[in-house]
């Protein structure tokens, strides 16, 4: 089992902290981390020279300034920041933002996504997927609604005790993926699987709130402990510009093909 697939407690530092990169994980292209600010550390600035960046506000409220414009972020709001544009994040209270980035050759427009107005009631972006015991809500925050080269970002929220990422599927030839877990109250936990062959899984570990898992190969379902949900932010990175930037197009584990993924 590889130790650089699991990153525990990604929220243990304030400021802008890039937790996983191609240098310390199995990722080929994607880097990701957290921006956590409060009244003691209310502002950070970031360079964005050769990469596109996505931001998703997990908790609190803050503002993002890009190119002379300012955008207010609260729960599940998102930002797409193009290559070559620096940005500043400011809060006067508390904000916790998940950041993902990857290199690209192309430049796309800045795009702000308001979760309540743009995503929550949009049937193309909010998907109610599966059935008991694998029911979950998928919110696509940065997806086909936003012009970009490689990155997608959103959240999956399960019912207590349910499976997600079910039926088991994989996309190793086209995309790498991050799962960052949130809102899993203690003593609840989840269990994350990654395997090409179920008889000898590459990864099978309990995961807690603020843990992150990098997925570069294999089927990757997870399950919540009874009475508790398993919720996570996901970030997908296409292995090529403008090629596999989609949530769908996955390979379902043989034997489970009759169960719809609901991914599109």
Predicted regions and their residues:
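A gly/proline- and charged-residue-enriched helix-loop-helix capping module
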Residues: 106-131
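Acidic/histidine-enriched, beta-strand-rich ligand/metal-binding domains
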Residues: 187-264
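Glycine- and acidic-residue-biased ligand/ion/polar-headgroup-sensing regions
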Residues: 49-67, 160, 173-211, 223
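Short histidine-centered beta-strand/loop micro-motifs
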Residues: 43-49, 90, 165-171, 203-205, ...
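Ligand-binding loop in jelly-roll beta-barrel domains
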Residues: 70-74, 83-112, 208-209, 217-243
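Extended, compositionally biased flexible segments
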Residues: 24, 31-91, 95
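Short, structured patches in soluble enzyme cores that scaffold and shape functional sites
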Residues: 91, 99-104, 140-143, 155-160, ...
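A short glycine-rich, His/Asp/Glu-containing loop-to-beta-strand
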Residues: 11-44, 129-178
């Amino acid at each position: 089992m590889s130790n650089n697939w699991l990153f525990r407690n990604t929220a243990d530092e304030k400021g802008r902290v890039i937790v996983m990169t191609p240098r310390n994980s199995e990722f080929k292209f994607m880097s990701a981390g957290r921006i956590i600010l409060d009244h003691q550390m209310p502002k950070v600035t970031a360079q964005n020279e050769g990469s596109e960046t996505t931001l998703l506000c997990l908790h609190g409220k803050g503002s993002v300034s890009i190119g002379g414009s300012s955008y207010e972020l609260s729960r599940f709001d998102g930002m797409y920041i193009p290559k070559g544009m620096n940005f500043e994040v400011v809060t006067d209270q508390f904000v916790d933002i998940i950041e993902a980035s990857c290199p690209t050759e192309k430049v796309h427009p800045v795009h702000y996504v308001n979760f309540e107005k743009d995503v929550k009631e949009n049937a193309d972006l909010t998907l109610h997927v599966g059935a008991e015991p694998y029911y979950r809500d998928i919110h696509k925050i940065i997806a086909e609604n936003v012009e970009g080269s490689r990155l997608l970002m959103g959240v999956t929220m399960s019912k207590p005790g349910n499976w997600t990422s079910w039926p088991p599927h994989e996309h190793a030839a086209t995309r790498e993926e991050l799962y960052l877990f949130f809102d899993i109250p203690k003593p609840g936990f989840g269990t994350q699987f990654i395997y090409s062959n179920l008889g000898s899984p590459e990864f099978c570990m309990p995961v807690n709130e603020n843990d992150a898992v990098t997925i570069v190969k294999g089927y990757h379902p997870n399950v919540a402990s009874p009475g508790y949900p398993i919720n996570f932010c996901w970030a997908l990175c296409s292995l090529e510009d403008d090629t596999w930037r989609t949530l769908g197009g996955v390979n379902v584990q043989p034997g489970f093909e009759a169960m719809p993924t609901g991914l599109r």
